[in-house]
Design a protein with these regions (language model features):
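Short, surface-exposed linear patches
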Residues: 57-61, 85-86, 106-110, 134-136, ...
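Active-site phosphate/pyrophosphate-binding segments
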Residues: 1-83, 156-176
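Short alpha-helices
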Residues: 4, 125-176
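Feature representing long, continuous alpha-helical segments
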Residues: 7, 45-48, 52, 82, ...
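Glycine-rich, anion-gripping cofactor-binding loops and their flanking helix/strand elements
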Residues: 69-105, 135-149, 157
């Protein structure tokens, strides 16, 4: 599975460039002021990375939150003005993530789903799908982070920001 990773990542990046999907999403979401990112299990860290990337290079407030804890706070924020990005590839926690998407949609929230290619259910349930190749569950988090980084990158570009030199960010952390 690990040997196939570079090819899968390359194909994902090629498809993203060919389709123009992320530039179109940036056009839709560049003026959004807040985002909620949800992930469960291994994908919680990926959701946090996606939120962090959006903050760092697009200067948009974003929170990465464990999907299982959504009812303990973030659910109160969900509406049509606060988009939610869910990391929901087909793996052992998929059904629980589908339930989260349904709860968000019941509150008229906009959902962008990082989902496995060919996932017909999320293609219909989410407002937008960021597809990743089907893969071994231990490879999925590596693939799932790519759409989130592309999304942040395109939003920053759409806003005219320098993605190579984000403001107030150091390339290293110094311990005193």
């Amino acid at each position: 599975a690990l040997l196939a990773l570079p090819g899968m990542a390359g194909a994902l990046l090629d498809e993203a460039q060919r389709s123009g999907r992320y530039a179109r999403l940036a056009e839709i979401f560049h003026a959004s002021r807040n985002f909620l990112y949800l992930g469960r299990g291994m994908h919680y860290a990926i959701a946090r990375e996606g939120a962090l990337k959006l903050k760092e290079i697009a200067y948009i407030h974003a929170e990465g939150y464990p999907a299982g804890e959504m009812k303990h706070g973030p659910i109160a924020l969900i509406d049509e003005e606060w988009p939610t990005v869910v990391v929901a590839p087909q793996d052992r926690v998929y059904d629980k993530m589908v339930s989260q998407v349904e709860q968000i949609k019941a509150r008229r929230g906009k959902v962008l789903a990082v989902a496995s290619e060919g996932d017909a259910y999320l293609a219909g349930a989410a407002d937008y799908v960021l597809p990743i190749p089907a893969a071994n569950e231990f490879i999925l988090p590596i693939l799932a982070v790519l759409p989130l980084q592309l999304f942040a990158y395109e939003i920053a570009r759409r806003k005219g920001l320098d993605v190579d030199q984000p403001r107030n960010l150091a390339k290293s952390v110094t311990v005193e």
